[in-house]
């Protein structure tokens, strides 16, 4: 994913399918490293389904060589700019 596509899709909900057939990972695109192609996805957690009470989100770092396909899920609303700014603050402070 090039930097232009990353910026355009930032905050979009994506499903990543793996070359090795493991279960797909889903989440909102936070960033993509321009050198390695590593994706960073944010997966907000809901209280009903999580084993850890204090956790509100999960981050996935997915190496580009493990990715078979990236599928956008248009049925999910993208994160708004305020939410992205909050994650930016969390990850860069």
Swiss-Prot record:
Keywords tagged on the record: mRNA processing, mRNA splicing
GO molecular function annotations of the record: RNA binding
Keyword Protein biosynthesis attached: no
Residue stretches making up the Sm domain: 1-76
PROSITE patterns: SM
UniProt record, GO biological process: spliceosomal snRNP assembly
GO cellular component: SMN complex
InterPro entries in the record: Sm
Record has Chaperone as a keyword: no
Knocked-out gene: effects: Inviable cell population.
Function: The SMN complex catalyzes the assembly of small nuclear ribonucleoproteins (snRNPs), the building blocks of the spliceosome, and thereby plays an important role in the splicing of cellular pre-mRNAs. Most spliceosomal snRNPs contain a common set of Sm proteins smb1, smd1, smd2, smd3, sme1, smf1 and smg1 that assemble in a heptameric protein ring on the Sm site of the small nuclear RNA to form the core snRNP (Sm core). In the cytosol, the Sm proteins smd1, smd2, sme1, smf1 and smg1 (5Sm) are trapped in an inactive 6S pICln-Sm complex by the chaperone saf5.
Subunit details: Part of the core SMN complex at least composed of smn1, yip11/gem2, gem6, gem7 and gem8. Interacts with gem7; the interaction is direct.
Protein name: Uncharacterized protein new12
Species classification: Eukaryota, Fungi, Dikarya, Ascomycota, Taphrinomycotina
């Amino acid at each position: 994913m090039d930097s232009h596509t990353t910026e355009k899709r930032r905050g979009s909900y994506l499903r990543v399918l793996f070359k090795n057939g493991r279960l797909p990972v889903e989440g909102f695109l936070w960033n993509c490293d321009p050198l390695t192609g590593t994706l960073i996805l944010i997966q907000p957690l809901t209280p009903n389904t999580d084993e850890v009470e204090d956790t509100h989100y999960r981050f996935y770092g997915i190496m580009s060589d493990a990715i078979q396909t990236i599928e956008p899920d248009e049925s999910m609303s993208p994160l708004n700019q305020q939410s992205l700014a909050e994650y930016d603050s969390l990850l860069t402070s």
